[in-house]
């Protein structure tokens, strides 16, 4: 069962200097491959509060209301004191500038921001390096040319000619520095109708994208997010791995805990992490590694940044070790019913809260609330039964 007294194995403040402030919010400035709406981006700011420890985090005011305090209280936790809050684009960008220019802070960005918002000299992790490590076209550099499916990087104007030489199923990804997340920006094509949809998206992004990656679609038997952390004092630490839950088109449906990760998969991840560290990386990274029927490992995405399931791995001591599932939910419209249903399951001990974006901060039911959490229980069957009951209750209001 839940052990409320346990502390995380490792916290984010173990990895960063005292002058670092963390923001997980994507920039307000749009990007054709990453288009979460404003509320989703604000919701992301509360995701790491339980693993931050002393690391100051920039959080939207709606992600730190009394609702979150109530949920944390049930599990014996408190909202950290070391948070900086904002409430709109102007206050967010002003806060970042003030922290850097007036308070001599370095900002650790989950997603890079434009130079007009903050000059790269104020980044905790070198911006050029961060961009390079997360550029999908440069994956072969960080894997030493190993763990790669058949792939080709092409100029966007050559794409429609080149794609004629490929067979389905295939994957198309942006080959530039713009970030993607949760499968958005990754286009899996099983047939010509999928390809035509992808071509439409590519045309919309032509102004900001120079190149694309075409990749053989791996028929995987397992899809792991293998995670590591590094600081100079700690060295490289293996945090664990989570199984990625995605639909057939690669869209993210959460993570579940996994045991008995094959050693050669962990070792592949460690080699990639070592390459990043040798370039100057520090912090948390998670690598999407597929295993096919022949036990070959393929690196399909390298996230040299925190991942959605990082909290699940770092909070393992707090959770039932049987089965865990990380996911998030949106209110159906009645935010009070949404919150009360969540509170019920948190009190029952089957639902572990991570973040709560309070839509009522904007006015009653003006915006749909959102909730990030970990389900945990003795078995997968028990957890999924609880989740089904929870979803059914959310529908009845």
From Swiss-Prot:
Residues where Mg(2+) binds: 288, 301
Domain of life, source organism: Bacteria
Enzyme class: ligase
Annotated keywords: ATP-binding, Ligase, Magnesium, Metal-binding, Nucleotide-binding
Variant or mutagenesis effect after changing residue 309 to A: Loss of activity
Oligomer status and interactors: Primarily a monomer in solution. Minor homodimer formation.
The protein, known as: L-aspartate--L-methionine ligase
Organism, as annotated: Staphylococcus aureus (strain NCTC 8325 / PS 47)
């Amino acid at each position: 069962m839940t052990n409320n007294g346990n502390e995380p194995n490792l916290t984010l403040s173990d990895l960063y200097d005292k002058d670092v402030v963390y923001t997980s919010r994507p920039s307000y400035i749009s990007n054709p491959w990453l288009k979460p709406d404003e509320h989703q981006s604000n919701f992301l700011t509360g995701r790491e509060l339980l693993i931050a420890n002393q690391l100051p985090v920039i959080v939207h005011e709606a992600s730190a209301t009394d609702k979150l305090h109530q949920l944390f209280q049930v599990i014996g936790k408190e909202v950290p004191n070391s948070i900086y809050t904002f409430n709109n684009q102007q206050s967010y960008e002003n806060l970042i500038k003030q922290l850097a220019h007036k308070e001599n802070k370095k900002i650790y960005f989950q997603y890079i921001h434009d130079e007009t918002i903050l000059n790269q000299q104020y980044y905790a992790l070198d911006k050029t390096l961060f961009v390079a490590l997360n550029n999908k076209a440069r994956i072969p550099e960080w894997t030493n040319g190993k763990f790669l499916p058949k792939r080709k990087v092409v100029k966007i104007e050559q794409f429609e000619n080149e794609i004629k030489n490929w067979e389905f199923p295939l994957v198309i990804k942006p080959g530039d520095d713009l970030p993607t997340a949760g499968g958005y920006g990754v286009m899996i094509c099983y047939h010509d109708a999928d390809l035509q949809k992808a071509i439409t998206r590519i045309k919309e992004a032509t102004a900001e994208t120079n190149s694309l990656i075409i990749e053989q679609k791996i028929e995987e038997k397992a899809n792991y997010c293998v995670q590591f952390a590094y600081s100079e004092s700690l060295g490289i630490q293996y945090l664990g791995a989570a199984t990625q839950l995605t639909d057939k088109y690669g869209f993210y449906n959460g993570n579940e805990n996994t045991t008995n990760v094959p050693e050669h998969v962990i070792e592949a991840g460690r080699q990639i992490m070592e390459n990043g560290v040798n370039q100057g990386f520090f912090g948390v990274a998670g690598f999407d590694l597929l295993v096919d029927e022949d036990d070959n490992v393929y690196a399909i995405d390298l996230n040299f940044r925190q991942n959605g399931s990082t909290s699940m791995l770092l909070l393992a001591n707090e959770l039932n070790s049987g089965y865990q599932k990380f996911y998030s939910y949106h209110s159906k419209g009645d935010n009070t019913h949404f919150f009360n249903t969540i509170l019920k399951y948190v009190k029952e001990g089957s639902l572990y809260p991570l973040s709560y974006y309070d839509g009522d901060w904007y006015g009653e039911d003006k915006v749909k609330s959102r909730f990030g959490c970990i389900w945990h229980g003795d078995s997968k069957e028990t957890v999924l039964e609880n989740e089904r009951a929870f979803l059914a209750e959310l529908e009845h209001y």
